[in-house]
Amino acid sequence: MTTVVSNAREIAAIDLGSNSFHMVVAKVVDQDLQLISRHKQRVRLAAGLDEQKNLDEESIQRGLECLAMFAERLQGFEPRNVRIAATHTLRQARNANLFIQRALDVLPFPIEIIPGSEEARLIYLGVAHTQPQADSMLVVDIGGGSTEMIIGKGFEAELLNSKQMGCVNFTERYFANGKLSRKNFAQAIVASEQKLESIASKYRKKGWQMAFGSSGTIKAIHEVLIGQGHEDGLITFERLSKLIEKLCEWDSIDDLQLPGLTDDRKPVFAAGVAILSAIFHGLNIKEMHFSDGALREGLLYEMEDRFKYSDIRLRTTENLAAKHLVDLEHAAKVKGHAREFLAQVANELGLPEGSELCDLLEWGALLHEVGLSINLQGFHRHSAYILRHNNMAGFNSEQQLVLSNLARFQRKSLKLNELDDFSLFKKKHIIGLIRVLRLAIVVNGQRNDDPLPPLTLSAKDDEWRLECEQPDWLENNKLLHADLQTEQEYWREVGWQLLF
């Protein structure tokens, strides 16, 4: 008897790394995630960054050609079933938005630029889901432009860092002439150890039960060690030291001939070995296992585990609110009105059903006063700074940018020329959220326990109207009336109309 599975669906995750782009496709069957295929293309994106931190046309073109190939596999996929994360190089690139806009022409799915801390958390999640459970794990991932180091238990990362040292940028800095020498290795190792100085003692003190390495650099080291006769593939400091001695037997990177070392990994292999050697020494790692799981697997598992994802963001916002002594009762009232107002004008704003901007508005409402912990004067700017620069687990860079802009424009004059540019979201939608949040804040400005009568918000282009079934509602709320008149003037200054 054959059982027909009706609830299977395919999901895909893409990792836009500094050295290579990776795609993994999986099938979700009931509660099981079955990997179907992996795809990898070396694009050397980091090599295209010039001195002004702009990507050159050649590297952009290499990236677009790879994404066009990925697009063939993803034909018919719904946007909710594809997640694309960009890492270090696109974090650094000043023209990242240009690349993302051109990428949308060949691969019509949103690209998220994720902070280093979020990259580290997702890497840990990918390893944790694909390895036997240990009481605690250290995970190290050496990418093209950055290295992530995470200690956690179960599926939760507890200590994480992302350092700007990768196999591509360290190759350019310490092996630029293609020469292999003890001097070049020593310089690269010392530079790596300097990057680790501020965090190494924390990692040693916290400790871990098992160490895992993920992604291309550590995979290559693992396979070369097997080729050297270490059948268990374990990485140790002693084996790394001997590997460096072995590499110095060649004068040039181009001449390297090692079993297990592929041609595409060869140019950046020496720098990767140097970085990992420094990490072993600085963190006092005894041995490391290789893990197939990494960032893209973390993206996959988080896509399917949506409740866990929501819990992470809820925990992040709650912790940030507690840290900055936010008045949660007041914030909840603002959040409630923001939710109601947005539901009333969402169609006019053109917001698609289920848009994540609805969630971001609620998070923004909860956190709009975090800046009060710094100073009452200009607290909206302080709030914006905190939300832009904090490590916020569960949020990518652009989501944090939305929160920051909501905080920045929650009150006072609307200097819209200071509004940031977005690649994942339309600016008109962000402006709509700003209007909604401002009104939710104004109607709760009295900060008292007297309930407001039910309010109705409607919008037609730049004319918005706030109404109440009780005709004399503002007669009984003189202070609110004055606040609305002040808000009305702020709107008038930018060509908007607020009626009430």
UniProtKB/Swiss-Prot annotation:
Principal location class: membrane
One MF annotation (Gene Ontology) recorded for this entry: exopolyphosphatase activity
Cofactor: Mg(2+)
Catalyses which reaction(s): [phosphate](n) + H2O = [phosphate](n-1) + phosphate + H(+)
GO biological process: polyphosphate catabolic process
Membrane topology value: Peripheral membrane protein
Record carries keyword Acetylation: no
Subunit structure and binding partners: Homodimer.
Family as reported in the entry's similarity comment: Belongs to the GppA/Ppx family.
Name by which UniProt lists this protein: Exopolyphosphatase
Organism field: Vibrio cholerae serotype O1 (strain ATCC 39315 / El Tor Inaba N16961)
